[in-house]
Regions:
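Long amphipathic N-terminal alpha/beta scaffold segment
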Residues: 51-96, 100-103
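Conserved PLP-enzyme active-site core in the AAT-like
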Residues: 120-337, 370-371, 451
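Long amphipathic alpha-helical segments
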Residues: 1-68
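Glycine-rich phosphate-binding segment of PLP-dependent enzymes
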Residues: 35, 40, 82-83, 93-119
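Short Gly/Ser/Thr- and Asp/Glu-enriched loop/turn motifs at secondary-structure junctions
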Residues: 9-10, 80-84, 293-296, 396, ...
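Structural motif of enzymes handling amino- and sulfur-group chemistry
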Residues: 306, 314-315, 322-370, 382-383, ...
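A short linear hydrophobic-aromatic micro-motif
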Residues: 75-76, 143, 287, 422-427
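Conserved C-terminal alpha-helix-loop-beta "cap" of PLP-dependent enzymes
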Residues: 356, 360-441
Length: 457
């Protein structure tokens, strides 16, 4: 340890003004904290013998200013999604429509009718804001919203199957991420999982053979994040609903992603709709709000009134209920389906509906802008993905602007783009950076081009 070096470390007060001059938008508190952390780190380096010398004051101020800027940069902030993955789980899944975002902001900023009945002047139900819409759109007798689909399944099984058995196909024992698995959730709900059939083949007769005195329900789980192909067979929801009802049991279906729109129109196959499950006879259907539905994070339950009334009275519901902003955004999203504007106004559906011709034209436009800045870019046909644990094994025909960096490696370019104030997240393939058009908005092009130009150095 060099005591002379310790004495040469500047005092906090000496660095405050010059540091603040480098980051004038930072608060005084952030600058002071950053200067202290910078000097503390330097002191530790001297004590450990790692610092060969004391840096110049200007260098210390630059380090502190950078730390102050980082400290005041919001952790949760907008991202430019150039991955072509529409429901990117790590980037927040579904983007809200302008109408839904405004509804959420209004609910946050103002007092609201969250649990207030304007007719009677008494207490109302927060579920009432979306229940009628959900019933109208799905044909269900009743509806309920909780904070995500995992919560919806948890509430459903806890309230209606605790202490009994639930019959599920072995081929549908899914994990949806974060170690949230059907067998574990059954155990947590106090129910016993009764597996039937095999991984690739399960028939209605397998369910029938498993029904006994302890059976509380038959359940079908849509394998939204994987597919079993080849020599396969599964019981239809219609078969299972009829079987369950013939034995005096309820039939549940967990759709996972869930949809209110027939995605076959976009060339996306195998995704059932909520209304289809209701028509098939399901007593309760669950799905997510922030995936194919295109709304906020929520768990949606629709089905028979007799089932959902039990859920509405269960004490667990209070722990799983949604807030006013979620309800406002969900109501606005559902109204888009009700008035027929969903495909044109909900970003998720609009992105899924984008044709290859539209995307190719957009890719040409972006490449022209990139070329004008001296960036090497060309239009490249590339497959996009739905994402969000939805529609596995299907790619959407898309186009990208493929950038070949001139002054750095492609991985360095990608890293620099990620670290910008507004991060740009893209893909790397064929030794080029791919900017996929399906998930980009035209109003983002100029900022994206500037980001690439400034990062390719």
């Amino acid at each position: 340890m060099d005591k002379a070096m310790l004495r040469n470390i500047p005092k906090v007060d000496e660095l405050l003004a010059p540091t603040h001059a480098l980051c004038p938008d930072a608060s005084a508190a952030a600058v002071t904290a950053a200067v202290r952390r910078t000097l503390d780190a330097l002191r530790e380096s001297v004590l450990s013998g790692e610092a060969p010398e004391i840096p110049e004051t200007a260098a210390l101020c630059a380090l502190a200013a950078d730390a102050a800027r980082r400290a005041e940069t919001p952790s949760l902030r907008p991202v430019i999604n150039a991955t072509g993955v529409v429901l990117h789980t790590n980037l927040g899944r579904a983007r809200l429509s302008g109408r839904a975002a405004k509804a959420a902001a209004d609910a946050a900023e103002h007092y609201s009718t969250l649990e207030y009945d304007v007719e009677s002047g008494g207490r109302g139900s927060r579920n009432a804001h979306v229940e009628a819409l959900l019933c109208r759109l799905t044909g269900a007798e009743s509806a309920l919203v909780v904070n995500n689909n995992a919560a919806a399944v948890l509430l459903l099984l806890t309230a209606l199957t605790a202490g009994g058995e639930v019959v599920v196909s072995r081929g549908e024992l899914v994990e949806i991420g974060g170690s949230f698995r059907v067998p574990e959730i059954m155990s947590a709900c106090g129910a016993t999982l009764r597996e039937v059939g095999t991984t690739n083949k399960t028939r209605a007769a397998d369910y029938a053979a498993a029904i006994g005195e302890h059976t509380r329900a038959l359940m079908k789980v849509h394998t939204s994040n994987y597919r079993i192909v080849g020599f396969t067979e599964s019981a239809s929801r219609e078969e299972l609903a009829a079987l369950a009802h013939s034995r005096g049991l309820p039939f549940f279906e967990d759709l996972g992603s869930g949809s209110l729109f027939d995605l076959e129109a976009f060339g996306i196959h195998g995704e059932p709709t909520l209304q289809g499950s209701v028509r098939a006879g399901a007593d309760a259907v669950t799905c997510s709000g922030d995936k194919l539905l295109g709304g906020p994070q929520a768990g949606i339950l629709v089905g028979k009134k007799s089932c959902l009334d039990v859920l509405k009275r269960h004490p667990l519901l209070r722990a799983l209920r949604v807030d006013k902003m979620t309800l406002a955004a969900l109501e606005a999203t559902l109204r888009a389906y009700a008035d027929g504007s969903a495909v044109s106004t909900l970003p998720t559906l609009a992105m899924l509906a984008a044709s290859p011709e539209e995307l190719r034209a957009q890719a040409r436009t972006l490449c022209e802008k990139l070329t004008e800045r001296g960036i090497s870019a060309e239009v490249l046909a590339e497959g996009d993905a739905v994402g969000g644990g939805s529609v596995p094994a299907q790619t959407l025909p898309g186009f990208a602007a493929a950038v070949t960096p001139r002054h750095c490696r492609v991985d360095e370019l990608a890293e620099r783009l990620r670290q910008r104030e507004t991060p740009v997240v893209a893909r790397i393939a064929h030794e080029r950076l791919l900017l996929c058009l399906r998930t980009l908005r035209p109003e983002e092009y100029d900022e994206l081009v500037r980001a690439v130009a400034e990062s390719d150095r």
